[in-house]
Amino acid sequence: MVSLFMINNTFRLTLMALTFAGGYVTSAPTQAATNVLSDKAETIEKVNTKNIALSGVIKQGGLIVGKTLPSDTVKLNGKTLMVSAKGDYTFGFSRDDKQSHKLVITSINGDRVEKILIPEQREYNIQRIEGIKKSIMQPKPKAAIRARKDSTQVKAARKIASSLDYFAQGFIPPIEGTITGVYGSQRVYNGVPKNPHFGLDYAGNTGDPVKAPASGTVLLWVPDMFYSGGTMIIDHGQGVSSTFLHLSDSYVKKGDKVTQGQVVAAVGQSGRATGPHLDWRINWFDVRIDPALVLELQPLKTVQH
């Protein structure tokens, strides 16, 4: 059930979640996200049904965080998700996700609850540029080999499924600065689409401090990748990771534990960057998540039955 209510003269969309218990149905209102990127999305923040509590935005690029009993089994589209000792789990939607997702939670005594999630589709900024020389668009053979090696390292780091649950505690911006690039935008050169931009770009000056948006473990630090220059990946748990690109320096190393708000690196313009800035990316394994939507996540309270 969906309803509208007014707060401070602004209409908010409220999802009424059904709770099934002993043959009756109750409803619990939710608070919609305030970020302009999710105004039209179905937003779940502390939506509770029996054994279901979720926070996030059901939207392409959205990350969902759930909480249940640690003994419960959680499946998304038939695939079992990790559940932490505190009952936290997570999953996300890709940039172009158009499918219906089935979330199933089964308790230790066999009780089962299902929810269908369909991410809202988004429109992205597409820029078309003609007349670019082919020599500019294609890297030299040696550079291409190096770029593939870099990509292999990054993909390996993002496959790690640790038992950490820092993703469930919320995220903060890694830097205070003007946003100059957004998730999902794409350029088409001479009629050929290039890879979309999957990060959130912040303007900055070389040397500006970069903070950990959430606690975690440093999975990767390489100072000189071909495209992304100084590249750092921090594991926040269960496949959720932050990636920082174009860094000028790192104050931590692979394997270090970091806490939310800790200064871990410095802004730069390394790699193929036209000026100093921070490119912050979020992944759920190989699923590219919109960092702007992640900033809206709210921690969930312990589930009790």
Q: Where do the language-model regions lie?
A:
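Short, well-structured beta-strand-loop connectors
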Residues: 209-220, 251-267
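Cationic-aromatic interfacial patches
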Residues: 2, 7-8, 29-122
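Zn2+-dependent peptidoglycan hydrolase active-site motif and core
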Residues: 213-248, 276-281
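Small beta-strand-rich domains/subdomains or short beta-sheet motifs embedded
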Residues: 203, 209-213, 244-245, 255-258, ...
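Extended, charge-rich intrinsically disordered regulatory tails
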Residues: 256-276, 280-305
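Surface-exposed, glycine-biased beta-strand/turn segments
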Residues: 116-228
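Sec-dependent signal peptide recognition
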Residues: 8-17
